[in-house]
Design a protein with these regions (language model features):
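A short, N-terminal "cap"/entry segment at the start of jelly-roll beta-barrel domains
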Residues: 1-29, 42, 109-112
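Conserved short histidine dyad/triad with adjacent acidic residue
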Residues: 31-46
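Ligand-binding loop in jelly-roll beta-barrel domains
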Residues: 81-107
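Cofactor-binding loop segments of dinucleotide-utilizing enzymes, especially the Rossmann-like FAD-
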Residues: 57, 65, 100-102
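Structural motif
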Residues: 59-61, 68, 84, 94
Length: 112
């Protein structure tokens, strides 16, 4: 089945951020997300899931092991299981990105 943000399951998180489930299986998920300027998720980690964040448009900041790493269009970053991380948008424009998780993060999100 052909999938895009036009026909994918949509959800809102953090009151102002968008997510679209492009692939939603227990063994893997791919989500396209949009975070507006100033938006952020809370710091957390996953016990099992390994994630890869890939910037499609704009730039975002990943807090990872005490560092702030700026990711720009065409750049990605792997987050291993059990590593605290936080994605935020400190720019003046929306950031669009993919989050690929193996296995799915459903039920595997821990807020320290």
């Amino acid at each position: 089945m052909l999938i895009s943000v036009e026909n994918a399951e949509h959800y809102i998180w953090g009151e102002v951020c968008d997510g679209w489930h492009l692939l939603r299986r227990e063994d893997m998920s791919i989500i396209q997300e949009r975070v507006p300027a100033g938006g952020a998720e809370v710091i957390h980690y996953h016990n099992l899931a390994r994630q890869f964040f890939y910037i499609l448009e704009g730039e975002g900041t990943m807090v990872f092991e005490g560092q702030e790493i700026v990711l720009k269009k065409g750049q990605g970053m792997e987050i291993p299981p059990q590593v605290r991380h936080q994605f935020m948008n400190q720019s003046n424009a929306d950031v669009h990105f993919l989050v690929i998780s193996v296995p799915s993060t459903r039920g595997d999100r821990v807020h320290p």
